[in-house]
């Protein structure tokens, strides 16, 4: 009799546990990161009786999370790639939208400038035409400055985004480390049973962290997560969270970069090429590969235009018979010394041939008693040796070295980064416009003006290979093509994430129809065991009533 009652009670308890699990699944349907749970039942140990081994019902061995580590890892890898591509595309599309605006583009302003110059060539002695050219010159310079400032502001926004990302990463690392500690303690208290709700919270935090910076998860005994970034830097070790810091770059203090906080060595800058996944990797890649290239190409165009126009303008004579002067002011190359340099060397830079200057920054480093120069846009490296006067020439530039370098000293050379910010129109008096080719040729002499106009179609003015219009058109086209490619790549990777997410949810997600079915099934199971208990009670009453 007791066996019958015990079996029924074990069934009732198991049914109650299964109903609780099903109801918890249903109530948690909309909870982000929730993993479907299943009540696991097992046979109780049998008892040897007169007729052999007799069953003793059922017991609940645990509540299992329906979790597939392989699919989850695949999903994380896809998500961090998708997040990076999306972040890069969003930033790139801003540049594309800005450059493709036809009503206020550089192409429009430059065309207006040369149209005004054409009018002046046809009416070289007309003061109104001369004044109109000065006005169009100022409009062109203002458009250069507006475009450049937009890109500079975007650079500042990248700095802010890096700082915000680092704060989020540190916050997630602390929360995951805390959950590691709680899970470890509660698993011990629960005799090996894990707190499923905390496991879900931890996995959700890892997923969100992974979308900021790609991470890899290794599981210790006891279920503790150790988390490293894809570059090998540890973020979480058991219950200990490591920290990152957003710091000024030693190569360029105007830029924020990511450093690993080491208790002994302090802040160790992480090479940005190692941070290439997640939204943080996306914005870093955007800055180094897209934003820098756009700014440098724009600066190269401004430098080539201003210097070519100045050179030709100085070859002519103005309305007063005086030799022409510089028409435009333009910024000079910038050389940034790495803050970690040990030597006392200094480098100065000047432009010797604006048409040969390339749209790239350079890293100049001293190693093995040699100066190595790397074009950052193409990642090509070559060796240079200063002459007796400490001078080196390449790519339309001349560098002057003074002082004594130490091993691993480095500099960043930016030939055109400040070209536009310091650009201006120097000619404010219309009589100073040098249209004539000879000193006393008269107001109607327009030969130097024609030479200035011919610069528009010179195919070797920018980078030795393009005209002004072609260079700008190429920039707009390159940006548009790259943006379109990123859009496609982002959408494709998003589809991969969706497919893997659906696959993961088919295992771990809650299906309401399935849970409704489970409720009915376990309700019948509960009622059946209750019927067994009722039968046992009836038998017991019958035995009691025997007289």
Curated annotation (Swiss-Prot):
Record keyword Secreted present: yes
Localization annotation: Secreted; Bacterial flagellum
Predominant cellular place of this UniProt entry's protein: secreted
Record-level GO BP terms: bacterial-type flagellum assembly
Keywords: Bacterial flagellum, Secreted
Gene Ontology CC terms, in alphabetical order: bacterial-type flagellum hook; extracellular region
GO molecular function ontology, one term from the record: structural molecule activity
Record-linked NCBIfam families: flgK_ends
Family: Belongs to the flagella basal body rod proteins family.
Protein name: Flagellar hook-associated protein 1
């Amino acid at each position: 009799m007791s066996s019958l009652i015990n079996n029924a009670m074990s069934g009732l308890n198991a049914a109650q546990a299964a109903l609780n699990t099903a109801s918890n699944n249903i109530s948690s349907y909309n909870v982000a990161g929730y993993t479907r749970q299943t009540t696991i039942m097992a046979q109780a140990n049998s008892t040897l009786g007169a007729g052999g081994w007799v069953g003793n019902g059922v017991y609940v061995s645990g509540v299992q999370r329906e979790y597939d580590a392989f699919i989850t890892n695949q999903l994380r890898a896809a998500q961090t790639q998708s997040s990076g591509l999306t972040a890069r595309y969003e930033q790139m599309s801003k540049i594309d939208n800005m450059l493709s605006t036809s009503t206020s583009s550089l192409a429009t302003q430059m065309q207006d400038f040369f149209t005004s110059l054409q009018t002046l060539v046809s009416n070289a002695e007309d003061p109104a035409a001369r004044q109109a050219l000065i006005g169009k010159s100022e409009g062109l310079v203002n458009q250069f400055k507006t475009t450049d400032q937009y890109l500079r502001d975007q650079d500042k926004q990248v700095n802010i985004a890096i700082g915000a990302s680092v704060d989020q990463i540190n916050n997630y690392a602390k929360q995951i480390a805390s959950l590691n500690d709680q899970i470890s303690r509660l698993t011990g208290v629960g005799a090996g049973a894990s707190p499923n709700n905390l496991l879900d919270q931890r996995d959700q935090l890892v997923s969100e962290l992974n979308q900021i910076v790609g991470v890899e998860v290794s599981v210790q005994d006891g279920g503790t997560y150790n988390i490293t970034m894809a570059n090998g830097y540890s973020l979480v070790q058991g219950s200990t969270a490591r920290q990152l810091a957003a710091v000024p770059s030693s190569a360029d203090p105007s830029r924020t970069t990511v450093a690993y906080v080491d208790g002994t060595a302090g802040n160790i800058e992480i090479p940005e090429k190692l941070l290439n996944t997640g939204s943080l990797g996306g914005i870093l890649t955007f800055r180094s590969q897209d934003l820098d290239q756009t700014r440098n190409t724009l600066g190269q165009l401004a430098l080539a235009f201003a210097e070519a126009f100045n050179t030709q303008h100085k070859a002519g004579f103005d309305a007063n018979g005086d030799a022409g002067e510089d028409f435009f002011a333009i910024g000079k190359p910038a050389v940034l010394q790495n803050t970690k340099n040990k030597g006392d060397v200094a480098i100065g830079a000047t432009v010797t041939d604006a048409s040969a200057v390339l749209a790239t920054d350079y890293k100049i480093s001293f190693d093995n008693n040699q100066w190595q120069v790397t074009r950052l846009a193409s990642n090509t490296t070559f060796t240079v040796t200063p002459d007796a006067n400490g001078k080196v020439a390449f790519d339309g530039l001349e560098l002057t070295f003074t002082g004594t370098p130490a091993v691993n000293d480095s500099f960043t050379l930016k030939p055109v980064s400040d070209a536009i910010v310091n650009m201006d129109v120097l000619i404010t008096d219309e009589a100073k416009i040098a249209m004539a080719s000879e000193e006393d040729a008269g107001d109607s002499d327009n030969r130097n003006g024609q030479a200035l106009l011919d610069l528009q179609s010179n195919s070797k003015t920018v980078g030795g290979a393009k005209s002004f219009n072609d260079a700008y058109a190429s920039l707009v086209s390159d940006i548009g093509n790259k943006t379109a490619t990123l859009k496609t790549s982002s959408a494709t990777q998003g589809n991969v994430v969706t497919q893997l997410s659906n696959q993961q949810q088919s295992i771990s997600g809650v299906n309401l129809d399935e849970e409704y079915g489970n409720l009915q099934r376990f309700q019948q199971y509960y009622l059946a065991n209750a019927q067994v208990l009722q039968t046992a009670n009836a038998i017991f009453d019958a035995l009691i009533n025997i007289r």
